[in-house]
Structures are given as C-alpha cells and as structure tokens.
Design a protein with these regions (language model features):
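A structural signal for well-ordered alpha-helical segments within the folded catalytic domains
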Residues: 34-37, 41-48, 74, 174-181, ...
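Acidic/polar loop patches that form or flank catalytic/metal-binding clefts of enzymes
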Residues: 53-61, 88-92, 113-116, 193-196, ...
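NAD(P)-dinucleotide binding in Rossmann-like oxidoreductases
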Residues: 69, 82-179
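Charged, glycine/proline-rich intrinsically disordered loops and linkers
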Residues: 11-20, 130-168, 192-219
Length: 259
C-alpha cells in the first residue's frame, strides 16, 4: 500500500490568464498525467522493483473534492494495480489532507515493512520465526505496534533500547548522490569489462560478448535504467487513464516493450 497526502492546491500564480494556463498544465486533464502520474510514478517504480514484476491491470477512481477552481484533474485518486501471482498494490493520493504524509507499506505473512522519509521499519507477526539480529535491534513504537528499525549497523549499536526518532542519524547522502555514484561505478565496470574481453577474446564474437556482459550486469550496483523508467511511466499513465474513466484497464505485456 502506498500513499501521498499533502494539502496543497498545485496551482501556481501567473500575471495573465494565458500564462496561468501554461504554468498550471498539471491541472488540465487533457495533458496532465494527474496525481498518479506526477507523484505516484516514483512509488509505483519502487513496487515494480520490489516485486520484480509488471502490473497486468489497474482500476482507478478519482474525484474533485477540495480544489473546485476550474481544474479538471482530480485532487483525490485511488488506483489498485494487479500483479501476477495474486499480488496487489493500492495507491492513494490526495491534495486535500496532509495527515500521515507519504509512505510505502509491504505486507507479508511474517512481517510488514514500512518505508517513509528515507527510513524503514519491520513489524513482525507474533508467530513469525526469529531471525536473531532483531533481538538487539533499535525499536520504535507506532501506536500499538513496535517497529524494528531497518538500518545498516544499528542491530547492535544500542542493545535492547528504544530510540527516539531524533537520535537515529539521517543518511547524509541525497537520492541524487546515490544515483550518480551508481551510474559512475556501473559505467566504469561496464567499460572495464569490454576492455578485458577484447584483450582476451575475439572482439567480433558478439554473442560471447553479450553473454559476458550479461554476467557482469548481475554485479551492478542497484540503479534504475531507461527500461525501469519506461515501465513505471507506462504503469502510471495507464493508472491515470483508469482514474479519469473510473474504470479497470488491462495492461497488455506488449505495451512495456519498445521496438
């Protein structure tokens, strides 16, 4: 389950009606991908990566409840994605309330994992098998549930203590820094692999080179590429189409392919 709750109009001020129309293109349903396309695309990409699957269908609903100012894009949307194997993603977004902000929740039979504000917690079921490391992990209370902080190096740093949010260090690196680092590392390793291959084997053997690079690709630093971006875009646009028509849309596998 994913959500984006933020009370804001999405409308920008402009000196003339013409300029207002230009800067507020996101409010025009004819050209805007809507909340699910503008905001939800990043969260949908996360689920596609987590499941390692593409959605097969999406059902959408939308309405204008808060900002009835002439816009045609809904300010409240819900989209339910269907994935192979009976998996579902429920995505909701609103511009009418900021309560509970933005989060990503993955529900499993042994635990649930919540991601928000670049932090993560695991909520174990009572009958879940013990993993061992979580016994000494930092824990935080969420209403009636206890969340085990998921952070590298924090399973033994403060044994059996409950940390306050302010006491848990935030990651100093931005998402952009991680993305650029991954790009540089992967690009260098790819180029080095080609040099190694051409120095040891016949460079005209493209099939062997492809197999070699496919093996090297398995060791890449996690980073999204054009294919992941394209797939997330397709899913988000299909969801916006479903929201606009309050309908269920089947997503054919062919739409995720290029060429």
């Amino acid at each position: 389950r994913q959500q984006y709750h933020k009370k804001q109009s999405w409308r920008a001020a402009a000196p003339t009606p013409e300029r207002q129309k230009e800067v507020n293109w996101r409010l025009d349903q004819a050209i805007s991908p809507g909340l699910v396309g503008e905001i939800g695309i990043h969260q949908i990409d996360l689920v596609n990566w987590f499941f390692m699957l593409r959605p097969t269908a999406v059902t959408g609903f939308g309405s204008l409840r808060q900002w009835r100012d002439g816009r045609t894009v809904p300010d409240n949307v819900v989209a339910i994605f269907e994935y192979p194997g009976g998996l579902f993603l429920t995505y909701e977004a609103t511009l009418g309330s900021s309560f509970d902000g933005e989060l990503n929740l993955f529900f499993g039979s042994d635990c649930a994992v919540m991601l928000r504000d670049r932090r993560a917690w695991m909520f174990q079921e009572i009958d879940a098998p013990q993993l061992g490391w979580e016994i000494n992990a930092i824990k935080e209370q969420f209403y009636k549930s206890t969340g085990i902080v998921l952070a590298a190096g924090y399973s033994k740093a403060m044994p059996n203590q409950t940390a306050k949010p302010a006491e848990v260090p935030q990651d100093p690196k931005s998402p952009l820094q991680y993305a650029l680092e991954a790009f540089v590392i992967n690009s260098y390793n790819h180029q080095a692999a080609i040099r190694d291959f051409t120095s040891a084997y016949d460079p005209s053997d493209t099939n062997a080179l492809k197999q070699y690079l496919d093996e090297i690709a398995k060791m890449r630093v996690p980073a999204p590429g054009w294919a992941e971006g394209y797939e997330a875009t397709v899913a988000a646009l299909k969801a916006n189409q479903a929201v606009a028509g309050n309908q269920r849309i089947t997503i054919e596998p062919a739409v995720f392919e290029l060429g």
